[in-house]
Swiss-Prot record:
It holds the Pfam family Ribosomal_S17. GO terms for molecular function: rRNA binding; structural constituent of ribosome. CDD domains: Ribosomal_uS17. Belongs to the universal ribosomal protein uS17 family. This is Small ribosomal subunit protein uS17.
Length: 78
């Protein structure tokens, strides 16, 4: 099974080797037939502490690294 890859914006880089990425998704509400936006925050591993708040990044699933971290940064999104 391939690993999932998500794209989002770094909203926090305060943790050691950890960033928080906000991922936004849109979907059509089944009853209202209106496009709805939802966001979710993911803790991701950043080995080199290279990413700063506001960066667009891609994160990929990985084996659990801590209680909250199950994602790691792959690249900076264009």
């Amino acid at each position: 099974m391939p690993k999932r890859i998500l794209q989002g914006v770094v909203v926090s880089d305060k943790g050691a080797k950890t960033i928080v990425v906000r991922v936004e998704r849109t979907f059509l509400h089944p009853l209202l037939r209106k496009t709805v936006r939802r966001t979710k925050r993911y803790h991701a591993h950043d080995e080199a502490n290279a990413y700063k708040v506001g960066d667009q990044v891609q994160i990929q699933e990985c084996a659990p690294k801590s209680k909250l971290k199950r994602w790691e940064v792959v690249t900076v999104a264009a």
